[in-house]
């Protein structure tokens, strides 16, 4: 039991962006990578030719071209990093200080340049919270302080590597969230229960409950302590089953219980069990590479099934 409590503590600390917070905490490399790639995923155009241009610019930290696509991508990132509060309609310069203090011995940024960046953000007064007005207000600051921003938000190879090396509990790049959670919850213990869980059996064990807790938080299925139905619906949409949205919402709204395992059980015991398994498996594949869709990959059911079978065989034999 002690091992389970320690494992759960590690999970809640390392997948920190999705835990219930009493106060804001600095963003980890996993969190900033999720924010940037999710905003790219949501705002990149479908056209492959123009898509390539945006990706090349944004990955080089260039907020170009100056058009509606880049403007809304910029707003998405500012809100994701919580540098801008969409509800209060104001910038949050204090976030810059908190982010720096947390990683000041690892990110390579100096106190002086961080203070200047914070001051520049503090002085911003956008005409409105529209994509265009936020972009026009922030763009000059970005151009002046882009190198500071990269250091603060783990956008340099060297800085990110130092952070990862300093904390073995962080989810690694190219590591699926499911593998990460299995490692921290199960370790080398109770492999039978873990493999039954991989086969979508509801064992009810403490380990599986903690495993689902870890996965739901990491997938952002939990937001501000509550079930994030929008995120789950989004995963159904990615397997081309957006038509099931009303059913998903009904199942989760009617579900008794408050723990992630309860919601997971309701989906597994529902009439859309098989579709949920497909959506969950596809999210597992994508969780190993947050840029999976940005790179142009699309849903292929047989490819996902083959990948999951490969992983299960490796893990469970």
From Swiss-Prot:
Binding site for thromboxane A2: 58, 73
Keyword Secreted in record: yes
Cysteines paired by S-S bonds: 39-76, 72-131, 181-214, 195-316, 255-266
Cited InterPro entries: PBP_GOBP_sf
Listed CDD domains: PBP_GOBP
Tissues of expression: Female salivary gland.
Residues given in the record as serotonin binding sites: 182, 264, 281, 284, 308
Protein name: Long form salivary protein D7L2
């Amino acid at each position: 039991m002690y091992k389970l409590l320690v494992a759960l503590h590690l999970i809640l600390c390392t997948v920190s962006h999705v835990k219930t917070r009493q106060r804001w905490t600095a963003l980890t490399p996993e969190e900033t990578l999720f924010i940037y790639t999710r905003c790219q995923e949501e705002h990149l155009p479908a056209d492959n030719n123009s898509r390539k241009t945006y990706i090349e610019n944004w990955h080089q930290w260039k907020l170009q071209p100056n058009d509606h696509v880049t403007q809304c991508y910029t707003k998405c990132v500012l809100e994701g990093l919580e540098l801008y509060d969409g509800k209060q309609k104001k910038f949050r310069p204090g976030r810059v200080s908190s982010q720096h203090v947390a990683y000041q011995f690892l990110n390579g940024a100096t106190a002086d340049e961080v203070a200047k960046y914070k001051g520049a953000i503090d002085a911003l007064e956008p005409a409105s919270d529209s994509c265009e007005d936020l972009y026009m207000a922030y763009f000059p600051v970005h151009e002046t302080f882009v190198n500071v921003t990269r250091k603060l938000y783990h956008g340099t190879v060297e800085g990110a590597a130092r952070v990862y090396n300093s904390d073995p509990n962080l989810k690694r790049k190219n590591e699926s969230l499911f593998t990460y959670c299995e490692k921290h919850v199960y370790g080398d213990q109770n492999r039978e229960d873990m493999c039954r869980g991989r086969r979508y059996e509801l064992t009810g064990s403490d380990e599986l409950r903690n495993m689902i807790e870890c996965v739901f938080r990491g997938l952002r299925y939990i937001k501000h302590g509550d079930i994030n139905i929008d995120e789950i619906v989004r995963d159904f949409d990615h397997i081309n089953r957006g038509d099931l949205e009303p059913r998903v919402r009904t199942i989760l709204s009617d579900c008794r219980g408050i723990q992630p395992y309860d919601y997971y059980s309701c989906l597994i015991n529902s009439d859309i069990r098989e579709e949920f398994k497909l959506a969950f498996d596809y999210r597992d594949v994508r969780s190993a590479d947050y840029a999976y869709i940005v790179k142009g990959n699309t849903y292929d059911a047989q490819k996902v099934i083959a990948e999951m079978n490969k992983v299960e065989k490796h893990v469970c034999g």
